[in-house]
């Protein structure tokens, strides 16, 4: 959906406040990565709900979705105007210096972290932590970059005494999923929420009575619809991406939050196990 064109063509249909919002977004589209609905409401002296309703009027689910779409549109339009530079990743081009690349990557990652944190439903997160802490078995699924995030989480959870199954091979993931039981938990990590392998594993887990927790984007997807609980992640990457850099940053922020929350549930024993694990690893390093 071309939101930039929609805003330009909708002048006659907008209220005074909506026109104010549209004018700001059109004038500052290149700076939207650092703009939140709260800050925008304050700056324009309108209510935060007015901004959300404006986004929905254009066809977006909320301001975050509208802003991300505008950023992507702006990036694509700029690429068309400057097609001598090759897009390497997101807004990074072949003409950027290493210093510029570093700044762009940092901005992209900061955006992902801040937006993921601002969208977090902490009551839901607390429920999820309690569920995972009581699970007989925790399965973690993911492919590609999401699989790396899953492996990191599985290692951390095993350090504090949880039984975790996290296999990279998708055939093995499916085999584990179909053997889950009521009381087990599957943590499915997929930003798109539409990876066939992850969706099939989630379906199998649900069929067996296990609880499915999805770490995914805000976009409506098969995984999002299947999950009992969702933990939302936001990435500042556009379609021009060479790797899931800020996506992994957002996912890691959620999995790290899960881990620390679970350590907090049983802090003394968890810290004792982490210390024992470190001692053993140090002994291995000396051999």
Curated annotation (Swiss-Prot):
One of its GO terms (molecular function) is DNA-binding transcription factor activity. Residues 128-268 form the SIS domain. GO terms for biological process: carbohydrate derivative metabolic process; N-acetylmuramic acid catabolic process; negative regulation of DNA-templated transcription; regulation of carbohydrate catabolic process. Pfam families: HTH_6, SIS. Residues 1-77 form the HTH rpiR-type domain. Coiled coil: none annotated. The keyword Nucleotide-binding does not apply. Keywords: Carbohydrate metabolism, DNA-binding, Repressor, Transcription, Transcription regulation. The keyword Repressor applies. Residues 37-56 bind DNA. Pathway: Amino-sugar metabolism; N-acetylmuramate degradation [regulation]. InterPro entries: Homeodomain-like_sf (IPR009057), HTH_RpiR (IPR000281), RpiR-like (IPR047640), RpiR-like_SIS (IPR035472), SIS_dom (IPR001347), SIS_dom_sf (IPR046348), Tscrpt_reg_HTH_MurR (IPR022821), WH-like_DNA-bd_sf (IPR036388). Homotetramer. PANTHER family: GLUCOKINASE, HTH-TYPE TRANSCRIPTIONAL REGULATOR MURR. Represses the expression of the murPQ operon involved in the uptake and degradation of N-acetylmuramic acid (MurNAc). Binds to two adjacent inverted repeats within the operator region. MurNAc 6-phosphate, the substrate of MurQ, is the specific inducer that weakens binding of MurR to the operator. This is HTH-type transcriptional regulator MurR.
């Amino acid at each position: 959906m071309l939101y930039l064109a929609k805003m330009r063509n909708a002048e006659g249909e907008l209220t005074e406040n909506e026109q104010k919002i549209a004018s700001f977004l059109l004038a500052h589209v290149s700076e939207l990565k650092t703009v939140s609905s709260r800050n925008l409401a304050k700056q324009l002296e309108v209510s935060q709900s007015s901004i959300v309703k404006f986004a929905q009027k254009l066809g977006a689910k909320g301001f975050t979705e509208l802003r991300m779409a505008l950023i992507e549109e702006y990036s694509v339009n700029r690429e068309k105007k400057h097609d001598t530079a090759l897009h390497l990743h997101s807004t990074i081009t072949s003409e950027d210096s290493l210093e510029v690349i570093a700044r762009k990557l940092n901005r992209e990652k900061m955006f992902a972290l801040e937006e993921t944190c601002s969208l977090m439903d902490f009551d839901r997160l607390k429920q999820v932590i309690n569920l995972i802490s009581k699970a007989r078995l925790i399965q973690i699924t993911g492919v590609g970059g999401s699989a790396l995030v899953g492996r990191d989480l599985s290692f951390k959870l095993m350090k504090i005494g949880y039984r975790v199954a996290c296999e990279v091979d998708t055939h093995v993931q499916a085999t584990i999923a179909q053997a889950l039981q009521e009381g087990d938990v599957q943590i499915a990590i997929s930003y798109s929420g539409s990876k066939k392998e992850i969706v099939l594993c989630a379906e199998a887990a649900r069929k067996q009575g296990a609880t499915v927790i999805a770490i995914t984007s805000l976009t409506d997807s098969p995984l999002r619809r299947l999950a009992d609980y969702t933990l939302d992640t936001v990435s500042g990457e556009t379609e021009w991406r060479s790797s899931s850099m800020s996506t992994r940053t957002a996912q890691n922020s959620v999995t790290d939050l899960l881990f620390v929350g679970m350590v907090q549930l049983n802090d003394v024993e968890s810290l004792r196990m982490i210390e024992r694990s470190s001692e053993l690893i140090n002994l291995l390093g000396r051999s």
